[in-house]
């Protein structure tokens, strides 16, 4: 797991609690989206269970910042950032059996007709709540969903989310950032 760093108690517990409360309130705006995988001609998932809710905190492609962006600043401020590519929350509802999404990289570039992973991006998966879902890497490593935990890894590592069966929802925040190579990030807690 040399390219994968797990950090527990990633942000101040008060900031985590505030973020969790805001994201799970009735007024928080979620949209329906496909997780990963094949779509039909209409752009809909071929698998009806391949659905989750999203909230875009930031997206450079659309020059979009959510009014809730300030709540992810404690996560962002833990890094030495050159640029934010995107910050997106995912909310999966409980499933009877664990559902594994397709392995993927978060951001790709087109090289001719081939997609290649964006090499200068660092991914952070931040876990909003604890549950028995997890993030699995194609190399076999699994990172359990523990509230206020972050897993940090290069965008070139293929990974997938696995749904939970023990709680009503699994909420994560997926950050894709360009970090300063000159000053490696300091991680709280060691």
Where are each of the predicted segments found?
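Conserved metal-binding segment of the jelly-roll/cupin
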Residues: 143-159
């Amino acid at each position: 797991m040399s390219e994968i760093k797990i950090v527990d108690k990633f942000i101040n517990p008060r900031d985590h609690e505030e973020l969790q409360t805001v994201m799970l309130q009735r007024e928080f705006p979620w949209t329906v989206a496909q997780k990963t995988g094949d779509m039909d001609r209409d752009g809909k998932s071929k698998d009806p269970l391949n659905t989750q809710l999203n909230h875009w905190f930031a997206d450079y492609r659309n020059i979009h910042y959510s009014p809730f962006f300030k709540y992810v600043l404690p996560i962002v401020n833990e890094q030495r950032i050159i640029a934010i590519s995107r910050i997106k929350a995912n909310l999966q509802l409980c499933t009877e059996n664990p559902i594994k999404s397709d392995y993927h990289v978060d951001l790709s570039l087109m090289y001719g007709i081939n997609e290649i992973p964006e090499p200068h991006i660092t991914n952070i998966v931040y876990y909003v709540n604890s549950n028995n879902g997890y993030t699995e890497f194609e190399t076999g490593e699994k990172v359990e969903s523990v509230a206020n935990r972050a897993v940090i890894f290069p965008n070139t590592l293929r990974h997938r989310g696995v749904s939970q069966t023990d709680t009503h929802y699994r909420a994560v925040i997926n950050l894709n950032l360009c970090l300063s190579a000159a000053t490696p990030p300091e991680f709280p807690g060691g």
